[in-house]
């Protein structure tokens, strides 16, 4: 319970920011989960589109201060590393089948 008017205002402001930050973090997590699920299913074209959305959301969340910029960079890196490994494996399978 705030003791002063300014503390009450700060509490309201803090709650608004907490909810806004939670929205950005949730959106980022949702896109990452969707991308992982599509990659596991083998749908790389759809995964590429969702990864673009995930990266955009992570960048915006970092810009708005919902997550730290290094956290966003790490998540993007891990997502792309997994995606690129799948693409590389798919290309190698295609080359082996054609020879």
Curated annotation (Swiss-Prot):
Pfam families xrefs: Ribosomal_S20p
Keyword terms of this UniProt record: Ribonucleoprotein, Ribosomal protein, RNA-binding, rRNA-binding
Stored InterPro entries: Ribosomal_bS20 (IPR002583), Ribosomal_bS20_sf (IPR036510)
Cellular component, GO annotation: cytosol; small ribosomal subunit
One Gene Ontology biological process: translation
Keyword Lipoprotein: no
Keyword rRNA-binding: yes
GO function terms (MF aspect): small ribosomal subunit rRNA binding; structural constituent of ribosome
NCBIfam families: S20
Biological role: Binds directly to 16S ribosomal RNA.
Similarity-based family: Belongs to the bacterial ribosomal protein bS20 family.
Record protein name field: Small ribosomal subunit protein bS20
Biological source species: Thermomicrobium roseum (strain ATCC 27502 / DSM 5159 / P-2)
Native organism taxonomy: Bacteria, Pseudomonadati, Thermomicrobiota, Thermomicrobia, Thermomicrobiales
